[in-house]
Structures are given as C-alpha cells and as structure tokens.
C-alpha cells in the first residue's frame, strides 16, 4: 500500500474543507442580489424623440443612459443596471429602491424646464440655466421648501420679466416642467393639482440671475426637483412598455424560502449519494461542495446579478452535476462486476464515461445559451447560472472527482474493497469466465423495453391527440408576460379572502379580472388586470397596500407589444434550441438519432404545455425557462442511451433486426439505473423547491417536475424506439439487397 497517496488524499480533503469553510460565506455575501431577492424596480422604456421628425440614434441612446445613471445616483442606487436593447429601448433595473413611486417619477421626468407667459409662449428654457445651479433651500419669509436656480444672463431675464409685467392682469410667469404641446395655463390653473410648477405674478423688472421656484413642495420634492435639474434633461421621451416592482419584504422572504429549499434538497442528495455509492458517493459530496463554491465565486467575479431563478438554477445544477458522477460510478461498477481489479475498473470506467458526459453537457448548454439570448432579465440570470453550473460541474465532477478517487485507488488501499463502490459481491464474476461480449449484471436485465414498442407508440400518439384537443378546448392560461396587462401581488401577515382583495381594489377604482390566493396561509393575493394602469394609479396602489398591510405590493405591467414579442421569442427559443441539438447530435452520432431525440423532446415540451392547459396553471416567462431546461435535460438522458447504443453497435456490428433489437434493449437495461438515479436526484431538488421555495417559482418547479418524469418515459419509449424502428427498416433494406 502506498501511504503517500493516502496522506495526500486526506491533506487535499482537509485543504478543500478549510477553504470552503473560510471562503464560501464571503463569496456568497459579495454577490449582488436581483430585484426579486432584495426588492426593487425594473422598467423597459420605449425611447421616442422629443421633437417630431428627430431620429433616435446610438449616440442619443447613450446620452439617455448617462442621464438615467445620474438620476439613479439621485435615488441613492449605487449599482444601477441600465442597458440599451435594440434600436429604441432602454431597460433600467434598480435593486434595493425603497420608494418605487419616487423612482418612477425621477427616472421618466424629462426635466425640460421652461418659463412661459399666460398664453403659453416660451420665454426661457433649460438652455438658459447655469449647469448644476439648482439647489433646495427654504423661503426666508414662509420657511417653506423652495428650489433656487441660476440663470446665465441677468439682462435676458430682465427683458422677460418686463414683458410679462406689461401683460397685466395676466402678468404670470408660468414655470413648467415637461410642457407638452396642448398644455394650457388657463385650463390648468382651474385644477386642484395643476401640471405647472409655479405661476408667480410679475410686478417689476428683475435683472438677476437668481430665481426662486415656489410650488408648495415638501422638502423631499424640492430636493428631487433640484437634483433632476442638475442631472440634466433627458434628450428623449420615455414610455413604459414593461415594468415590474418587488417589495423588499417579498424579496427577503423569497430569498429565505428558496435558500432553505436548496439546503434541504442538497442535503438529501448528499445522503443518497453516500448511501448508494458509498466511497465514490463521499467523493461526490466533496466535489459537489466545491462546485457550489466555485460557481458562487465566479458569479461574484463576473459582477453578475443573482435572481430567484438563478438560485433555482444553482440548486438544479447540483442535481445535474450529480449526473456526471453517477455516469462514471455506474461505469466503474460495471467494470468491477466483470471481475476487473479496482485500478483497472477505475481507469476503464473513467475512459468510457468521458464522451457520454461531454456530449450530454454540450446539448444542455445549447438550450441554456438559447435561453440566455431570448430570455427576459430574470430568465437571463437563470440561463447564466445554468451555463456556469454546467461548466463548473464538468470540471469538478470529471477532473476533481477523478483526481481524488485516483489517489485512493492508486494507493492500493481499495484493492480488496470492491464493496466500498456499492457493488454486491454476488454480482462480481470471475474475470476468467468473461470475454469482450460478456455483459455485467444489471438490476433490469430481465426487463424487455422493446417488445411492446408498438403499444407505446399508440399510447404516445393518443396522448398527443388528446393534448391537441385539450389545448383547442381549454387553451393556455397566459400570464401577463404573454397576454399583456397588469399583475399586482399583495402580501399580508394574516389570511386574505378574494372578496377582501377585490374590495381593496374597488376602493381604488380598479376592477381586477381575476383574484387568486396563494401562500401557505393564503396570505398572498394575486390580482390580474386586462389593461395597463398609469403611473398615478400604480402609485396609489403601492401607497394604499403599504399603509394597510405593511409591505409594498409587487406590480408588473406588460404592454401588448412586449407581450407579443415575448411570445414570439419563446417560439424562436424552442425552435433554435431544437435545431442546434439536431445539428450537434447529427455530427456526434447520426441524423436518425438526432431526429428521434428531437421527437422525444418535443413530446416532453408538448406534454408540459398540455398539463398546464388542463390544470389552468399560469404560463409566464419562467415556464419557457422550464421547457428549455427540460429540453436540455431530456436530451442529456437520451444522449446517454444513444452513446451506449453506439458503443454496442461498434462492438457487435448487427446484421439483422433481431441483433439491433437486442442492442437497444441491452443499452436501455444498462443505462436505466443511471436514468433513475439522475432523475431521482433532480426530482429531489425540484420537490424541495416546490414545497419550501418561493411561491413565485412554484409553477416553474411544477413544469420541471412534470418534464422530468415525462423525459424518462420519452427517452426510453420514444427516442430509442423510433431510432430502432427507423434503423431496423434500413437494415432490412440493406440485407434484402
């Protein structure tokens, strides 16, 4: 026995444990949390020129982003995320904003200050102001908050005041902020809350550069006005197309619930790996812990924003990371059952499993990349974490896991301890009794997966036809992401009723289309509205529910234009992911396997859609994330099966359909344990997310759970069986010739 390798193993494990204990918490604490985890505000603006005929250029968009960044600083947001999208859109994300009504006003106000006479003729505008010359102060007589500004030219102001003075009795100098064509002083002055800021009477000529703006402000309003004027006017007009706001209490609760769900799920996975795979399972637990740390650390280095779906992706990634370990460990167990030594089985198992793991991960990454390209901001967070998880898990599960296990294997300490790999001694053959065609014992070697394929084809076809009928009758319960409108989520510390929530909205003059209760104690009310309420109405809603229930409601609005775009992008995403997978599988395997795989993937996706239709669960953008995740995961399962088929095809070279049938059946028998164990680990995670996770990812978790179970069926009884029937027909034609 080589004690040096044993000592090296324990030193490495000690080093890893110490490093994880010391560095994991700081890495996790440094990560920037998204809106859905700490509360905040997100809005997608459509950018239009102030003057008709002007064009929105790249320079104009950049200038607008700079102006919005300055305004975000006024709000005290240290790290605003402001991005240009397309040719005429800007997305603004402000995490941690406490007063979202104020944020809305400060962001969208153009801050075009103008001085006009009572007939609305412009006399002065923002160009006449000294840069950064506005400040909030108090009137020396009334002690009311006011804003003082500095003008560039005292003589020009003198001429303006002289002209207005002569217009008595209409000698008002009207100060406007964001005057629009059609606005009228004479109409506004009759209103309780006029649009103009102030309208002082001018009784003498004023040759000065110091001007006071009085408007019955609060101190905060005066301060905001001064800050907006100093930040500079927006060079464009901004129109909200999509918005979502999350109350801080919602975010904190979502973070707590989802992290707790993750801890429970990961702990169960660790116990399963230790129980089923024993020593290799312990290695998997160590490498999975390293995977979690590295993923969080890289996410921090990227300055990426961690969203609720991102945490779900990290937790889901643990379940998927286990897959690489399971594939390798099952291969090692097969080699041990053939009577090989521990060292020989370890080397052979690692060599044979590498291509399978590589192909399975690449196909999942294809789906994740497409998701990143076509997803909304929160879905991009999910896709980023999923891609990062796949790449990191490949490194930890393939290289670190093998390195640590190799230290033990090469020490010769395990030479007589095959049982430590989870192998039953009675299933280990004498190597003298085996040859290249000998197959190891599997728990499912008596199962015939292919003899009833026609019945499964009929069953799958019947389910598809039934699904089409269900969709035609029930259709989908589209969320506002696709149907447009508004969604307002109210949280209370006590049980709510639909009647109570409806009355709350009625008191605000709003008529919700539907009201649904959620949460363990029915303390969350979700109201849907067909139209998109204006900013003033949203402000009233936030104030009302904050005062009544003590927490800000979550408000999301989607315009019809954006709703259609999201629906279109969802279809593009599924189509492009499918095409990408077909191309890759065709290159690595053959086009028949690619087509068979896509048929099973589309069946999975269609089954989930049908399930959501009949259960009336809401379909939103996270639903699309779930669909693409299942596509990536299900192809992973199918790839493992086809990789084993390819291996047997090279070795056995079938000449008849019976030979081909035997190969497919044998491949399914040998990979079924891996399929069950992998699905089980991912299902554990999904179920814990479903039970303990935040309510906002409940439908996402349900879609994943349904897809995972359907994916096992489709991999066994659709993908493999279609390829068998297709390849068998080709084989018969070749033999006939």
From Swiss-Prot:
Keywords: Cell membrane, Membrane, Protein transport, Translocation, Transmembrane, Transmembrane helix, Transport. It comes from the Bacteria. It is found in: Cell membrane. Residues 27-254, 300-301, 375-380, 475-569, 615-621, 699 are extracellular. Residues 1-416 are annotated as: SecD. GO terms for biological process: intracellular protein transmembrane transport; protein targeting; protein transport; protein transport by the Sec complex. Disruption phenotype: Cells lacking this gene show a cold-sensitive phenotype and a filamentous morphology. Residues 446-737 are annotated as: SecF. Induction: Shows maximal expression at the beginning of post-exponential growth phase and increased expression by glucose in the post-exponential growth phase when cells are cultured on rich medium. Expressed constitutively during growth in minimal medium. One of its GO terms (cellular component) is plasma membrane. The chain crosses the membrane at residues 6-26, 255-275, 279-299, 302-322, 354-374, 381-401, 454-474, 570-590, 594-614, 622-642, 678-698, 700-720. Residues 1-5, 276-278, 323-353, 402-453, 591-593, 643-677, 721-737 are cytoplasmic. Part of the essential Sec protein translocation apparatus which comprises SecA, SecYEG and auxiliary protein SecDF. Other proteins may also be involved. Required for efficient translocation of secretory pre-proteins under conditions of hypersecretion but is not required for the release of mature proteins from the membrane. Part of the Sec protein translocase complex. Interacts with the SecYEG preprotein conducting channel. SecDF uses the proton motive force (PMF) to complete protein translocation after the ATP-dependent function of SecA. NCBIfam families: 2A0604s01, PRK13024.1-1, secD, transloc_SecF. In the N-terminal section; belongs to the SecD/SecF family. SecD subfamily. In the C-terminal section; belongs to the SecD/SecF family. SecF subfamily. HAMAP family: SecD_B, SecF_B. This is Protein translocase subunit SecDF.
């Amino acid at each position: 026995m080589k004690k040096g390798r044993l000592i090296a193993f324990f030193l490495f494990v000690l080093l890893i444990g110490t490093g994880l204990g010391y560095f994991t918490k700081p890495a996790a604490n440094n990560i920037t949390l998204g809106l859905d985890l700490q509360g905040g505000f997100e809005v997608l603006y459509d950018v239009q020129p102030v003057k008709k005929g002007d064009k929105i250029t790249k320079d104009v968009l950049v200038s607008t982003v700079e102006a919005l960044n300055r305004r975000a600083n006024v709000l005290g947001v240290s790290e605003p995320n402001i991005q240009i999208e397309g040719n005429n859109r800007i997305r603004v994300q402000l995490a941690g904003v406490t007063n979202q009504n104020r944020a809305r006003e400060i962001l969208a106000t153009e801050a075009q200050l103008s001085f006009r006479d009572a007939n609305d003729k412009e006399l002065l505008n923002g160009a006449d102001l000294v840069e950064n010359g506005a400040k909030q102060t108090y009137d020396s007589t009334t002690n009311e908050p006011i804003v003082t500004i500095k003008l560039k030219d005292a003589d020009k102001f003198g001429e303006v005041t002289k002209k207005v003075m002569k217009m008595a009795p209409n000698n008002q100098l009207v100060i406007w902020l964001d005057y629009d064509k059609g606005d009228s002083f004479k109409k506004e002055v009759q209103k309780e809350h006029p649009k103009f800021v102030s309208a002082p009477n001018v009784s003498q000529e004023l040759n000065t550069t110091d001007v006071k703006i009085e408007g019955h402000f609060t101190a905060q309003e005066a301060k905001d006005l001064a800050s907006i004027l100093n930040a500079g006017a927006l060079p464009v007009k901004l129109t909200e197309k999509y918005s979502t706001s999350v109350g801080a209490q919602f975010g904190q609760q979502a973070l707590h619930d989802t992290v707790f769900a993750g801890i429970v799920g990961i702990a169960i996975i660790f116990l399963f790996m230790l129980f089923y795979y024993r020593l290799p399972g312990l290695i998997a637990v160590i490498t999975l812990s390293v995977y979690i740390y590295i993923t969080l650390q890289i996410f921090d280095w990227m300055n990426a924003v961690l969203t609720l779906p991102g945490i779900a992706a990290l937790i889901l990634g643990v379940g998927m990371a286990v897959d690489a370990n399971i594939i390798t460990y099952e291969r090692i167990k097969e080699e041990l059952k053939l009577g090989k030594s521990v060292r020989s089985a370890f080397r052979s198992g690692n060599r044979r499993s590498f291509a399978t793991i590589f192909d399975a991960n690449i196909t999942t990454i294809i789906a994740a990349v497409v998701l990143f390209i076509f997803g909304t901001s929160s879905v991009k967070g999910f896709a980023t974490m999923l891609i990062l998880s796949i790449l990191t898990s490949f490194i930890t599960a393939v290289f670190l896991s093998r390195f640590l296990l190799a230290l033990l294997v090469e020490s010769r300490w395990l030479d007589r301890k095959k049982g430590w790999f989870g192998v039953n001694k009675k299933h280990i053959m004498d190597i003298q009794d085996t040859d290249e065609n000998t197959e190891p014992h599997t728990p499912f070697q008596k199962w015939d997966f292919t003899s009833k394929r026609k019945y499964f084809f009929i069953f799958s076809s019947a389910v598809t036809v039934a699904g089409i009928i269900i969709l035609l009758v029930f259709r989908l319960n589209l969320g506002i992401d696709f149907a447009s409108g508004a969604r307002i989520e109210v949280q209370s510390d006590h049980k709510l009723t639909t009647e109570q929530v409806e009355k709350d909205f009625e008191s605000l003059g709003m008529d919700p289309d539907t009201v649904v209760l959620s949460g363990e104690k029915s303390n969350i009310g979700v109201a849907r509205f067909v139209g998109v309420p204006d900013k003033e109405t949203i402000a009233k809603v936030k104030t009302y529910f904050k005062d009544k229930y003590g927490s800000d409601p979550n408000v999301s609005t989607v315009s019809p234009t954006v709703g259609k775009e999201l629906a279109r992008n969802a279809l593009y995403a599924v189509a492009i992911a499918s095409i990408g997978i077909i191309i890759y599988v065709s290159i690595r395997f053959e086009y028949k396997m690619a087509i068979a795989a896509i048929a099973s993937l589309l069946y999975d996706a269609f089954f989930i859609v049908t399930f959501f239709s009949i259960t009336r669960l809401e379909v939103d953008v996270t639903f699309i994330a779930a669909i693409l995740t299942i596509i990536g995961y299900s192809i992973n399962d199918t790839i493992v099966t086809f990789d084993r088929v390819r291996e047997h095809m090279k070795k056995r070279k079938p000449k008849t359909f019976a030979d081909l049938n035997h190969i497919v059946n044998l491949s399914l028998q040998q990979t079924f344990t891996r399929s069950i164990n992998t699905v089980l680990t991912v299902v554990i995670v999904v179920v814990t997310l479903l039970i303990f996770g935040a309510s906002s990812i409940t439908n996402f978790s349900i879609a994943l759970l349904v897809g995972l179970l359907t994916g096992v069926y489709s991999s066994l009884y659709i993908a493999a069986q279609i390829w068998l029937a297709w390849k068998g027909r080709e084989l018969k034609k070749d033999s006939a010739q």
